[in-house]
């Protein structure tokens, strides 16, 4: 068998052999591996990183051996294919040093037959195919998904020097593999034939010898070489030999019959191609070159830069009929095949988007024809025959006379089947050309007249012939034979070789790009490419020249550059070009081109003019000015721009570059000046991230899987999803990373000082903010050299956008001043809001949250914005500002300017041009706090400007119940007041129609030593809004709309003598004591000390608050701590102790043997009636039976309350108009001579009793759900009829509640016949400290019997100060109730607890100067809620274990006289009317949004330490509170 031995240095020998014998794989030639040590073959590197595949055919009898190997040259990644385990193929590979993944086929391949082997790489997966019968895949568990390949593709073995260099091999064990023995052929990578680079000890052979074994494909009769002749490939199907003759040029069962339709290299084989025994055993391709080959065919391969040029100048063409024939084979869609002529006399034949294009112009206009196949395209790598004929024909015209006219009939056919016929226009029938005949391309294809393409042909052309009546030009033959008139440009192979395809690439991310060499296109140039995407925006091509400074003296710092760009914006394709004398921007096509289809773009220029075409639609352009030179000095960027853009200059007209819009989609067939660019190879060489060497469109929409987290908005992109995170507070591709928050207190800022001055015509800005102020700067661009700005600010609760483009310093038509847009309303609600700004030239769009966008158009021709800085919080660059916006107080997040998230970039240190003092993280903001240390302190500021509208904001913190916060008077009766009244905020004003009062809404008094936020506003429609923390109250007033203020604005109070002259609705009698902060007066942030016209009293910066705060142990013996601004005080009322901290003994009397008594009598006109009572006393005794304290009503009423000892246990009995009610502590023995404290409370029929620290005993009356409504309705009934109604209610089984007309308090029990003997201390009853009064010889007290005062009376300073403080804050409303001493408690199993009481008043009903003087009429003047809760147990609750049984009151009563019955009936009618009015009252309405409360007062309260009751009590309290500030009259 004839062989060609390939030794070391085999690259030259192998290539020489292939040139002599033809393409080795076209006719089935293979490589024979003898299995010798040192054998190997190296093919070009297979870039198997991502998605790719290779295939080959294998034939062997060996059971072991290395078939294929490549790696990353000693690091981590490799792929190995070996024969093992009885001739089966085993594949192993690894990525990123992961555990290698291995698969083993089930089918042995060492049967001496040919097998097709295919390896497909897909990131972490690799699949191995054997013939059509087996496919297996395996996945490697790697953190990285792309494989790195550095080495060549080694087949059959490894070079000895590589085996010896251990560090060069990633898989060390591959050195020990046996070499492969057998044959391998048809090695292909991604369907393209791969040729060996070099080899050692490997033979080239076209047909492997028979190996014996009886295979159907092995030799037939003796003397024959096998079943399949002429290089046919044999395979076994159903135990029968089947020949594949597709690559031989023969056909038939055994590939013995000549095929007349020969393709590929087969056309070279003419004459007798049979095999002879006298051929010295030369096999493979060589035998095909023997014998009579008949007519020789002339073929040439063009790779994009080669072409033929035949000079016609000596023998010009002049013809009316002619014919052009040629055959072509290619994989490329576009390319020039033939051209002759110039100006308006030419013929052009080209491949355009896979179809054959013919353009003929004989001087009267172009005739164009396009021939397309029915299915697919002509660029299918198969041979196609083209024939163009032009004949002169005579036709008859119709008109005034019959005239014979000549026309040229043009016919073009492809493969003899697809034909198109047309006519050139009349009068011009002759084709004349004295120029050149171009074949396969030209020096500048884009500049050829009529050329529909700009790139040269890539592929094979065969038998290119032009002929007419006078001449026959066999252009292919003339080129090969070296005719002197034929010039060959480039290295042309006169055979058909495979031309590497210009594979498409995909830019998967906006950040991915490819750098191309500098484009030298000073005078002329062309670029063509195809693209495909569904994304609306992206920079496709960009390059610029050397920067040069603007010659305009008005703007010396403006840098100009020549540039060229093609970009997509909003789905439209734009060409941008500037040659130094002005920019041209052309929309290439009116329709959008982001529909996912392929579009062919062809750009051509010649000096100032040129065209850009999309598919077949061409748009001409002419650049302004005189310059015709395009001077590009930088690289040409494809798909985007590098991340480090320091050296780049972006013209303002290239919007996508400044907006950071990279292209995402596919690009293919890039030709520059007619030369192809293998962008796939460039991407591999540059190791560009995010560039994939293929193009496919996923059918599934990525957004269907909801990939955007945290409510991000999803948009489908090109094989990806795009999340809009601007309104979420998160960042990242999927909105998965929480964005950084910046906190501003009015003195803080963040300033981005850009490295170079920026000039833009398009901006994308988004941010989130949260503020309680109606004014404040959010973001602004500022310039050191001009008034240019793009500014976002809060203005009266709305977002205001201001865009000012300064026309003074440049040559432009003067604009009409800043453009402004407003959006949103009431945005100072302490909620997060999202702002988006989009500017495109003159067009503006402003959006807040999800509201409708506000749009506007800028006046003038100037659209360029200049800025050096991006500022937030405070504007520091103020040189060109006519008015400075108010500083910002609040929070900012997710500030993004043209794709740059500056807050997070600044925090992470990704940029070094960031200056800030704003604080990272969400913080409670207390700006510029000031302390008013006394109630006489105040400041005066300039008059409040609030004529048409008003927005006030401040924060305060105090322990005072009352105080004037703000006051400003004006013309006439106009004024405004903000004050605290009993811990609640009042807003009082008069616009000229009379004073109005709006009470702020809050769940509890605001004097809790915590910060509270107050916003007060009035809009132009007289809508008044008061917001306290999260509670909102609104009111609309009629009449006058303007607040005309004139005098100074007082903060914190006024002069002492001024309080007397304040308007009637103003309660304040003294100033505010506490802290104020963040004061905002209609957008003005005053410094309360520096800006004050004058100050009075003690005012200091900062807010330290009380130096001493209430703690759990501030007061002893269960005393209640009361927080004061200058300290604390203790309420010792219910402790029996006294002193500043309730740790001193209370006033004590000893009752000796024989008994004694202390009696207190109320004056006849001052006898209280109460719904609630509180009693506390300390004692020590050894008696088993005694009465300690008894309170009786006036004679004849029978109401009483008695504290007594029975059988050594303490108990209370009381009667408020029904049967006696008793409550007793049965578990505590108190007659042990030790000191005990007993506390008793009553509210209606409810009662509690506690001894020392024992659990509280609770007593609940029988009743129903009407109790609360009846209690409210009873207020409407005159007192004189109250007893009648109570009697009627008693009949109905309802509990009475009022302890009427209390007359005496008797201490000692002597009158009751059970005199007390022992010690009594610190008696407290409903605000009266009777033992103290006795010791001070009060006139209403009488002492009889053996009673002796122990020691001295406790200091009146402490006791009286506490009592005075208590009394001064008391309210005498009938609705106020006593707070229980402790939460409801299970009688057993719970340890004793100390539960201090809250600061509330006893429910004492007294006559008032503001009420009717009748002492029996106790109709309240101003009902209001008090305390925390009544101790009424929640409905449906089971009795506590061990507690006293709930006693139902008897419904029996004494008989009623007729008059009383009549009065009761009248009262029933009144009651029903009152209930009807109550249920249908108009309470007004306002909106309260508590869904989000971001500013939380996290500090623990240092006010009074009060433990509230469990839900049963809290619920009752809430029901009472909702009736506060309501007045009812009957």
Curated annotation (Swiss-Prot):
Membrane topology: Single-pass type I membrane protein
Predominant subcellular localization, coarse grouping: membrane
Signal sequence segment: 1-30
SUPFAM superfamilies per the UniProt record, alphabetical: Concanavalin A-like lectins/glucanases (SSF49899)
Residues involved in Ca(2+) 2 binding: 788, 805, 864
Glycosylation, residue list: 125, 190, 705, 813, 1246, 1408
Protein's cellular compartments: Presynaptic cell membrane
GO molecular function: metal ion binding; neuroligin family protein binding
Keyword vocabulary terms for this entry: Calcium, Cell adhesion, Cell membrane, Cell projection, Disulfide bond, EGF-like domain, Glycoprotein, Heparan sulfate, Membrane, Metal-binding, Proteoglycan, Repeat, Signal, Synapse, Transmembrane, Transmembrane helix
Any one GO CC term of the record: presynaptic membrane
Residues covered by the Laminin G-like domain: 31-212, 299-496, 503-695, 741-914, 928-1103, 1149-1347
Keyword 4Fe-4S in record: no
Any one biological process term the GO annotation gives: cell adhesion
Disulfide bonds: 228-243, 245-255, 460-496, 666-695, 703-714, 708-723, 725-735, 906-914, 1075-1103, 1110-1121, 1115-1130, 1132-1142
Binding site for Ca(2+) 3: 1199, 1216, 1298, 1300
Residues on Extracellular side: 31-1454
Region (Interaction with CASK): 1497-1523
Family stated for the protein in its record: Belongs to the neurexin family.
Physiological role: Cell surface protein involved in cell-cell-interactions, exocytosis of secretory granules and regulation of signal transmission. Function is isoform-specific. Alpha-type isoforms have a long N-terminus with six laminin G-like domains and play an important role in synaptic signal transmission. Alpha-type isoforms play a role in the regulation of calcium channel activity and Ca(2+)-triggered neurotransmitter release at synapses and at neuromuscular junctions. They play an important role in Ca(2+)-triggered exocytosis of secretory granules in pituitary gland.
Name of the protein: Neurexin-1
Species assigned in the record: Bos taurus
């Amino acid at each position: 068998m004839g062989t060609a031995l390939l030794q070391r240095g085999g690259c030259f020998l192998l290539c020489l052999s292939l040139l002599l014998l033809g393409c080795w794989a076209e006719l089935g030639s293979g490589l024979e591996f003898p299995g010798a040590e040192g054998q190997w073959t190296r093919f070009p590197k297979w870039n198997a990183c991502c998605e790719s595949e290779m295939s080959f055919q294998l034939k062997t009898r060996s059971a072991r051996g290395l078939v294929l190997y490549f790696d990353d040259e000693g690091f981590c990644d490799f792929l190995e294919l070996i024969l093992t385990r009885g001739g089966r193929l085993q594949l192993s590979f690894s990525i990123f040093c992961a555990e290698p993944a291995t698969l083993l086929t089930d089918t042995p391949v060492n049967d001496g037959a040919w097998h097709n082997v295919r390896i497909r790489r897909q990131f972490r997966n690799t699949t191995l195919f054997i013939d059509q019968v087996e496919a297996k895949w395996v996945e490697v568990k790697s953190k990285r998904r792309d494989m790195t390949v550095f080495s060549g593709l080694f087949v059959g073995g490894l070079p000895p020097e590589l085996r010896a260099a251990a560090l060069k091999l990633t898989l060390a064990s591959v050195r020990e593999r046996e070499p492969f023995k057998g044959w391998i052929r048809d090695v292909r990578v991604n369907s393209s034939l791969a040729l060996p680079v070099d080899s050692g000890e490997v033979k080239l052979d076209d047909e492997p010898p028979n190996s014996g074994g009886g295979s159907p494909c092995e030799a037939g009769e003796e003397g024959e070489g096998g079943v399949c002749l002429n290089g046919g490939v044999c395979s076994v199907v159903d135990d029968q030999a089947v020949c594949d003759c597709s690559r031989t040029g023969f056909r038939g069962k055994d590939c013995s019959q000549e095929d007349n339709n020969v393709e590929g290299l087969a056309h070279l084989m003419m004459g007798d191609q049979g095999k002879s025994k006298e051929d010295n055993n030369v096999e493979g391709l060589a035998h095909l070159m023997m014998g009579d080959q008949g007519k020789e065919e002339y073929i040439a391969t063009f790779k994009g830069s080669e072409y033929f040029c035949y000079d016609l100048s000596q023998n010009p063409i002049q013809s009316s009929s002619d014919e052009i024939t040629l055959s072509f084979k290619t994989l490329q869609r576009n390319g020039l095949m033939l051209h002759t002529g110039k100006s308006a006399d030419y013929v052009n034949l080209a491949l355009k988007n896979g179809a054959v294009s013919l353009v003929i112009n004989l001087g009267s206009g172009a005739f164009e024809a396009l021939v397309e196949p029915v299915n697919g395209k002509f660029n299918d790598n198969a041979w196609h025959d083209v024939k163009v004929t032009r004949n002169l024909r005579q036709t008859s015209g119709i008109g005034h006379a019959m005239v014979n006219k000549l026309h040229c009939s043009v016919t073009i056919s492809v493969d003899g089947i697809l034909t198109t016929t047309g006519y050139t226009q009349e009068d011009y029938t002759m084709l004349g050309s004295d120029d050149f005949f171009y074949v396969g391309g030209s020096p500048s294809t884009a500049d050829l007249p009529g050329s529909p393409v700009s790139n040269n042909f890539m592929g094979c052309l065969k038998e290119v012939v032009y002929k007419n009546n006078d001449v026959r030009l066999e252009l292919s033959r003339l080129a090969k034979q070296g005719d002197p008139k034929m010039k060959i440009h480039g290295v042309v192979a006169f055979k058909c070789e495979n031309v590497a395809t210009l594979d498409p690439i995909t830019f998967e991310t906006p950040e991915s790009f490819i750098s191309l060499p500098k484009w030298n296109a000073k005078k002329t140039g062309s670029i063509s490419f195809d693209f495909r995407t569904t994304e609306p925006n992206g920079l496709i091509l960009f390059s610029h020249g050397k920067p040069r400074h603007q010659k305009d003296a008005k703007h010396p710092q403006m840098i100009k550059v020549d540039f060229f760009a093609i970009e997509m914006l909003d789905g439209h394709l734009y060409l941008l070009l500037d040659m130094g004398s002005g920019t041209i921007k052309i929309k290439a096509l009116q329709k959008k081109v982001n529909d996912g289809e392929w579009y062919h773009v062809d750009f051509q220029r010649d000096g100032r003019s040129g065209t850009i075409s999309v598919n077949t639609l061409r748009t001409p352009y002419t650049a302004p000015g005189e310059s015709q030179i395009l001077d590009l000095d930088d690289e040409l960027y494809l798909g985007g721009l590098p991340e480090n853009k320091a050296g780049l200059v972006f013209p303002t007209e290239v919007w996508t570059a400044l907006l950071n819009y990279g292209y995402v989609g596919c690009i293919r067939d890039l030709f520059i000046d007619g030369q192809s660019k293998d962008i796939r190879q460039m991407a591999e060489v540059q190791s560009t991230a995010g560039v994939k060497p293929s193009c496919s469109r996923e059918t599934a929409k990525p957004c269907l899987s909801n990939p955007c987290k945290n409510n991000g908005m999803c948009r489908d992109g090109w094989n990806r999803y795009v999340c809009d995170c601007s309104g979420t507070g998160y960042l990242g591709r999927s909105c998965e990373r929480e964005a950084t928050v910046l906190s501003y207190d009015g003195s803080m800022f963040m300033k981005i000082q850009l490295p170079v001055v920026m000039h833009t015509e398009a901006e994308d800005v988004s941010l989130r903010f949260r503020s309680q102020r109606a004014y404040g700067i959010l973001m602004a661009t500022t310039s050191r050299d001009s008034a240019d700005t793009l500014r976002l600010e809060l203005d009266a609760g709305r977002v205001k956008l201001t865009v000012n483009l300064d026309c003074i310093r440049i040559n432009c038509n003067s604009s009409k001043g800043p453009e402004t847009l407003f959006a949103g309303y009431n945005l100072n609600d302490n909620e997060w809001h999202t702002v988006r700004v989009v500017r495109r030239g003159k067009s503006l769009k402003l959006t807040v949250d999800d509201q409708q966008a506000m749009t506007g158009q800028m006046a003038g021709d100037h659209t360029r914005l200049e800025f050096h800085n991006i500022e937030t919080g405070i504007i520091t660059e103020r040189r060109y500002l006519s008015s400075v916006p108010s500083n910002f107080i609040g929070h900012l997040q997710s500030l993004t300017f043209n794709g740059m998230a500056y807050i997070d970039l600044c925090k992470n240190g990704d940029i070094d041009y960031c200056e800030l003092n704003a604080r990272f993280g969400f913080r409670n903001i207390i700006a510029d706090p000031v302390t008013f240390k006394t109630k006489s302190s105040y400041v005066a500021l300039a008059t409040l400007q609030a004529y048409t509208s008003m927005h006030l904001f401040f924060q305060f913190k105090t322990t005072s119940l009352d105080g004037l916060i703000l006051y400003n008077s004006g013309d006439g009766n106009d004024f405004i007041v903000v004050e605290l009244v009993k811990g609640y905020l009042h807003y009082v004003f008069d616009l000229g129609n009379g004073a109005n009062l709006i009470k702020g809404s809050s769940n509890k008094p605001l004097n809790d030593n915590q910060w509270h936020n107050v916003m007060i506003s009035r809009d132009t429609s007289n809508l008044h809004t008061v917001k306290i923390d999260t509670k909102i109250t609104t009111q609309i007033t009629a009449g006058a709309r303007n607040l005309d203020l004139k005098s100074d604005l007082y903060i914190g109070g006024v002069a002492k003598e001024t309080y007397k002259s304040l308007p009637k609705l103003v309660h304040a009698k003294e100033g505010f004591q506490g802290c104020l902060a963040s004061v905002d007066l209609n957008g003005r942030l005053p410094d309360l000390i520096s800006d004050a016209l004058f100050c009075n009293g003690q005012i200091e910066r900062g807010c330290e608050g009380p130096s001493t705060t209430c703690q759990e142990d501030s007061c002893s013996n269960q005393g209640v701590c009361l927080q004061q601004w200058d300290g604390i005080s203790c309420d010792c009322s219910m402790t029996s102790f006294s002193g500043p901290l309730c740790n001193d003994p209370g006033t004590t009397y000893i009752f000796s043997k024989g008994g004694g008594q202390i009696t207190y009598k109320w004056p006849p006109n001052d006898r209280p009636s109460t719904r609630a009572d509180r009693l506390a006393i300390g004692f020590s005794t050894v008696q088993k039976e005694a009465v300690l304290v008894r309170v009786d009503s006036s004679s004849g009423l029978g109401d009483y309350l008695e504290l007594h000892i029975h059988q050594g246990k303490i108990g209370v009995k009381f009667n408020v108009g029904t049967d006696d009610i008793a409550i007793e502590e049965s578990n505590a023995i108190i007659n042990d001579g030790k000191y005990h404290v007993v506390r008793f409370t009553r509210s209606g029929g409810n009662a509690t009793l506690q001894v020392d620290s024992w659990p509280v005993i609770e007593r609940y009356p029988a009743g129903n759900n009407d109790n609360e409504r009846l209690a409210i309705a009873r207020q409407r009934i005159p007192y004189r009829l109250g007893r009648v109604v109570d009697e009627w209610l008693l009949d109905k089984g309802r509990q009475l509640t009022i302890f009427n007309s209390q007359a005496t308090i008797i201490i000692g029990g002597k009158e009751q016949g059970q005199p007390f003997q022992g010690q009594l201390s610190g008696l407290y009853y409903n605000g009266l400290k009777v033992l103290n009064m006795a010791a001070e010889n009060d006139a209403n007290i009488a002492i009889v019997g053996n009673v002796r005062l122990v020691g001295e009376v406790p200091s009146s300073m402490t006791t009286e100060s506490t009592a005075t403080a208590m009394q001064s804050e008391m309210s005498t409303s009938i609705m106020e109730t006593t707070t229980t001493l402790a939460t409801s408690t299970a009688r057993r199993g719970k340890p004793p607890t100390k539960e201090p009481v809250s600061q509330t008043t006893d429910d004492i009903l007294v006559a008032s100067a503001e009420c009717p003087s009748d002492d029996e009429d106790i109709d309240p003047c101003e009902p209001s809620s008090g305390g925390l809760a009544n101790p009424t147990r929640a409905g449906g609750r089971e009795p506590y274990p061990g507690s006293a049984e709930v006693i139902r009151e008897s419904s029996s009563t004494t008989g009623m006289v007729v008059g009383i019955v009549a009065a009761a009936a009248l009262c029933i009618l009144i009651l029903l009317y009152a209930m009807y009015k109550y249920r249908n009252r108009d309470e007004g309405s306002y909106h309260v949004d508590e869904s989000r409360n971001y500013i939380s007062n996290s500090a623990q309260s240092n006010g009074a330490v009060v433990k509230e009751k469990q839900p049963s009590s809290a619920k009752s309290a809430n029901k009472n509170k909702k009736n506060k500030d309501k007045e009812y009259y009957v």
